[in-house]
């Protein structure tokens, strides 16, 4: 994957308290929740991220004492900019620094990922958390999500500017089709694995393999898998273009990614398609 950090952030104010519960205030929701770290998870979804980070740290041997916390920031909520990962990372940093827990950034990324799995119900990957914790200005991150090896690729398109549009269409991964898409991809992998050994995920699958066993897959499953396989190759081509300073080719690969997300993976929307069409027509 090839994520990058942006100039938006979530900020945490944090201090230990002498009580028996944690008090957490969300500026965005203007709501305070009391957390019992040895009790049930909270009913408010935003508070589950804080609770989950604490639980995942304690699973790894940390002792989390009661605290007071307030957080807010300028990362748009539900806009596809990984506000949940930013919150997990900020909370993780605050706890790690205050209590001297000794977790490194890779461990904090895994803690954030497992928070989503175990306390929010989203079987997410690790890209969003990794981008929040490892992103640097003027670079994108070429990340191998299996080994977690990564490389910072310079990103400085002279004469161009990257513009992020807010479609005003809100979503949450917890209530979106994310888990459905993941299950569809896993179904495709299972078909290929019946014939080809050593296949663990779609990164091990080629387009030829998919075409060979297409008849054993649901048509929708094939489309989902084909998008991922094609996107993996687009990423490699895009990185090669970046290393040459070829931002025209890089932009063409980005256009291909949008097309695949819209038509094959079907996770776009009319509003986003409208904005993409305007971008394509603009020199």
Q: How would you name each of these model-derived features?
A:
Residues 1-85, 89-105, 110-114, 119, ...:
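ATP-binding N-lobe of GHMP and related small-molecule kinases
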